[in-house]
Amino acid sequence: MIYVDIRGVYPLLSNSSILEAFFFAVSELMPRKKNLDVTVSICSLRSDTTGYHIKTDRYTHEIELERNQNKEDFLTALFHEIVHVRQTERGVYCDESRPYYKRPTEIEAYKLQEELLKKWKYLQS
């Protein structure tokens, strides 16, 4: 079963809309995934950060998203962090010896976040 717990409030989207976007991304990125437990915390982060992801246990993840950003950036950050969920579920971890933007995990996450956002916006229109 896929469990999602949203903590906090994002003023520009309802929690049900955030859940809808979450499940859209999971179905696009991990269509056969059956076991997943994700906590999405909406909070204030460092000024240069829009989101974080950490795997805390098998199938268990935490995502933190900056609450003070526009709706498109918020969704983009959500999709970006869900790409990291997929990566760690597949056993792919970031190489912190490389500069941030040269890490294969970040290159993939930035590419897929844009593809997901484009498809999401199309489906919502």
Task: Describe each model-derived feature in a short phrase.
Residues 61-78, 101:
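Short pre-active-site segment immediately N-terminal to the catalytic Zn-binding motif
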